[in-house]
UniProtKB/Swiss-Prot annotation:
Example of a GO cellular component annotation carried by this entry: cytoplasm
This protein's record includes keyword Cell membrane: no
Catalytic reaction equation(s): IMP + L-aspartate + GTP = N(6)-(1,2-dicarboxyethyl)-AMP + GDP + phosphate + 2 H(+)
Family: Belongs to the adenylosuccinate synthetase family.
Binding locations of substrate: 295-301
Catalytic residues of the enzyme: 14, 42
Summary of subunit composition and partner proteins: Homodimer.
Protein name: Adenylosuccinate synthetase
Alphabetized GO MF terms: adenylosuccinate synthase activity; GTP binding; magnesium ion binding
Entries under InterPro entries matching the protein: Adenylosuccin_syn_GTP-bd, Adenylosuccin_syn_Lys_AS, Adenylosuccinate_synth_dom1, Adenylosuccinate_synth_dom2, Adenylosuccinate_synth_dom3, Adenylosuccinate_synthetase, P-loop_NTPase
General function of this protein: Plays an important role in the de novo pathway of purine nucleotide biosynthesis. Catalyzes the first committed step in the biosynthesis of AMP from IMP.
Ligand binding (Mg(2+)): 14, 41
Length: 416
């Protein structure tokens, strides 16, 4: 039986997973999304055209690939329908798990209200209602995509939920829809989405049993994992490679090659510890050149130097076999580039990620910069200093770099 390969982000998300999945997708029969919701965003450039995807897997740009939204994803029908409208002839190419949980408008209202109440202690969520949706799932009070096939029954269940939660909703200022409006909305969702709702676990199993090539597409990044990330400044799902198993119904033996996606520098959206953040001109330069604004929220990403300590930690959690190094071109023209090789922590030098990362100070190694890597298609033709930078990352993390992106375009990728 063939195993499924996995692409996973190894930093705080926004590493460039979409480009890698889109590039590798031509070699696969099926591409699967396993967790997260429309708080995640993949940006793909093809022939100068920008595609921003939030729920639909990146393989949708390839006509012969089956795309799966797995049970671990939380699905906003409204967002999904809007996103699907960008593409033609999706039947037979896109399937949504009937076990995936529904993210509805009241979830985002709850999310935003709670963030406002936290004031300065706000986590900095996207406000898309992802956390409240997963909270409903864990408390066994959520609703699943398969329930859209019976809109009247789902409407009754939701109205009962609204009544039960009315004191909380009133306190938070959540607007509860009228029953007739809700029913019409659910009927519309059914009309559009019914042909795509399926038992996706069986579809993935069948593909593997038939020796089809399957690629799993992670969302966000390992350092945002609900258990192993910088809690509480994390997302609400398991973003590590093991999350792909629970989010699709696979066992660990069915995971093959793990490709860890890393950016040549580091970015983070929202609040939370970020040891290598550069709040000066270098960070501003990375943001400007790298166009570091969120695909989902448009928020400016915090930027800083490459952190080999956190990447090594995340790579161990994910079982990374090889790296895809993205946005190397953004560092073009820097006279000096830095890599964090250790932390100063409570008076000691450490080479691991402590639970309270906010108390860690980076210890940097400085390397000489380079002029430009744009348009280079062979590793040997990269500037010597760029190669030295890549090879030092490999030495510090213990993982080889197999792919190097030198521009947003699909074609500008070096394969070693």
């Amino acid at each position: 039986m063939r195993k499924a390969d996995l692409v996973v982000g190894v930093q705080w998300g926004d590493e460039g997973k979409g480009k890698i999945v889109d590039m590798l997708g031509l070699n696969y029969d099926m591409i699967c999304r396993s967790q997260g919701g429309h708080n995640a965003g993949h940006t793909i450039w093809v022939d100068g055209v920008r595609y921003a995807l939030h729920l639909v897997p990146s393989g949708i740009l390839h006509k012969n690939i089956i795309n799966i939204i797995g049970n671990g994803v939380v699905v906003s029908p409204e967002v999904l329908i809007t996103e699907m409208a960008q593409f033609d002839n999706l039947e037979g190419r896109l399937y949504i798990s009937d076990k995936a949980h529904l993210n509805l408008s009241y979830h985002s209202q709850v999310d935003q209200a709670k963030e406002r109440l936290k004031g300065e202690k706000a986590i900095g969520t996207t406000g898309k209602g992802i956390g409240p949706t997963y909270a409903d799932k864990i408390s066994r009070s959520g609703h699943r995509v398969g329930e859209l096939l019976e809109p009247e029954r789902l409407c009754d269940a939701l109205m009962h939920d609204f009544e039960t939660n009315k004191p909380v909703f009133d306190a938070l200022g959540v607007k509860i829809p009228e029953e007739n409006e809700l029913l019409e909305e659910l009927k519309r969702y059914k009309e559009v989405l019914a042909p795509f709702i399926a038992n996706t676990t069986n579809l993935v199993w069948k593909a593997l049993d038939e020796d089809k090539k399957v690629l799993l597409e992670g969302a966000q990044g390992t350092l945002l994992d609900i258990d192993h990330g910088t809690y509480p400044y994390v997302t609400s799902s398991n973003t590590i490679s093991a999350g792909a198993c629970t989010g699709l119904g696979l066992n660990p033996k069915e995971i093959g090659k793990v490709i860890g996606v890393i950016k040549a520098y580091t970015t983070r959206v929202g609040h939370g510890p970020f040891p290598t953040e550069d709040k000066g001109t270098n960070g501003d330069k990375m943001c400007e050149i790298g166009k570091e604004f969120g695909t989902t929220t448009g928020r400016r990403r915090r930027c800083g130097w490459f952190d080999a300590v956190s990447v090594k930690y995340a790579s161990r959690l994910d079982g990374v076999d090889t790296y895809a190094l993205m946005k190397l071109d953004v560092l073009d023209g820097f006279e000096v580039v830095k890599i964090c090789k250790a932390y100063q922590y409570n008076g000691e030098t450490i080479d691991y990620v402590p639970t309270d990362l906010e108390n860690a100070t980076p210890i940097y190694e400085e390397l000489a910069g380079w002029d430009s890597v744009k348009g280079i298609s062979r590793y040997e033709d990269l500037p010597a200093n760029a190669r030295a930078y890549i090879e030092r990352i490999e030495e510090l993390t213990g993982v080889k770099v197999g792919y190097i992106s030198t521009s947003p375009e699909r074609s500008d990728t070096i394969i070693r």
